[in-house]
């Protein structure tokens, strides 16, 4: 059953590709220039070419037929192709019969065939061909009335009966007329089929729109037609034909530079229409999806597909290519200019793919560094991919500076590549810190602060680079060529990459400063108080050699409580508000619960849970990106929720951080 479904899926795509190719050909065909060429040629007196408007109408009819073929249900589409195949077989039978009659007229032998070996060979060959045609036609049309397709065998039968050759010519024409009448009868009997199909399709569309709406109808058609795969196959066929046409006309092998130019030129030739441009967009999306899937498979193996079976990635790169192509008017340029512009757009797409690869690798690498996994192969894969993401973007930026004149788009590519390399450098530095802490007997002090400073340095550099890009874009807009699309891109880039990042970084800094001030304002527990308390930290579940005391008389590690205060300003146990003289400006707070009577220090909360009625304070959760969240990764190999075992997990900065993140 699975094989049948796969075959149907393949047919659903393969049978619709010709309709898109027909649309592409009709878009390329200029009717006016075609008639101008006809008028200059000897065909200008042909009545068929005297009616220009008729040809224009036929041009639009071709568009309608292409759209109908594209949207037909699979069963009707298969039936239509079978009818078309039957027509081709009948034409092949006509050609076989006509060639046989011509050969007999050339040799002019009217005697018995068994006396002439050559005549017998011609008869046998034609008879076998006609039998094959008749058999195939009856199989395709699923009928046992084989005589309906055997009219072209009449000249063979007449020759077998020693009919004169002049009469055989007349019989052959009669066979052609008879077959044509059969085709006309079939078309006439099915004349109302398209109308009935259109009527039933209209009823179904109206019902779907009334019940589910236009959006559901569009999504249903999108899934039934498999639009991304369909356009990708269409573009790959165009690209393969372009490559084949080039190599079929050349005898000598091309050099490496020539092959690169051929590759770009072929891509440029295959995106000269809106249909081929959409095909390139979906092809780039699938290529990006494949690269990102291989990246995740390289890092995690088959577990990557078990944890994340549906990777909805790759569309960002395709949409980026489409926006840039529309903005720059790609399909309206000449082939050479189009190839040059495509090279720049593809650089932008590659930079986006590298950034997506880093988004996949960053949490995996940090989780591997924070875990107790000692598999050298896993560490090698993670570090090798990070080294690739460190070197390749820098090399790409260097090549762009070498071969292209600097402008706004190239500056965006170079800045994105540099930021990717810097982010990988920060990821590797944090990974090294985790590994150093793993091999030390004692935990690294202030690990959380070190990680924060590393991330803060990267965020600051990222902000400065984004600011430089905006400044360069504004200067080009003022002193250079001004466009609406360019101004919109600068505005969007300024809002998302400058303003929001600056606002987020400032809030993060204020939250951290407020947490530090709160910790400093709390009293430090003495040795006698710790011995009298004789309990573990309720955040990290580790023994307490030093602790701070909250106003509600609860004991915590200073580092653990500080990380908790990054998230919310309440006691982890009783949720009493920890007041401080310096309130965080711009961040509101909600009413908190009063301390529960008899709340004990040894109350154990599950990870990721909250007491009934308690919600996170809006606006207090820090969102600094994937790397900031990964500094609170659990050290447990099984990644299960629950309480820590103090004997199994030694006291470290990473262990303390885990409950804070889950909170």
From Swiss-Prot:
Gene label: RNF145
**Which membrane topology term applies here?**
Multi-pass membrane protein
Can you tell which superkingdom this protein's organism belongs to?
Eukaryota
Function recorded in the entry: E3 ubiquitin ligase that catalyzes the direct transfer of ubiquitin from E2 ubiquitin-conjugating enzyme to a specific substrate. In response to bacterial infection, negatively regulates the phagocyte oxidative burst by controlling the turnover of the NADPH oxidase complex subunits. Promotes monoubiquitination of CYBA and 'Lys-48'-linked polyubiquitination and degradation of CYBB NADPH oxidase catalytic subunits, both essential for the generation of antimicrobial reactive oxygen species. Involved in the maintenance of cholesterol homeostasis.
Signal peptide coordinates: none
The GO biological-process annotations, alphabetized, read as: ERAD pathway; proteasome-mediated ubiquitin-dependent protein catabolic process
Protein name as it appears in the record: RING finger protein 145
GO MF entry, a single one: ubiquitin protein ligase activity
- Annotated Pfam families: TRC8_N (PF13705), zf-RING_2 (PF13639)
Q: What class of enzyme is it?
A: transferase
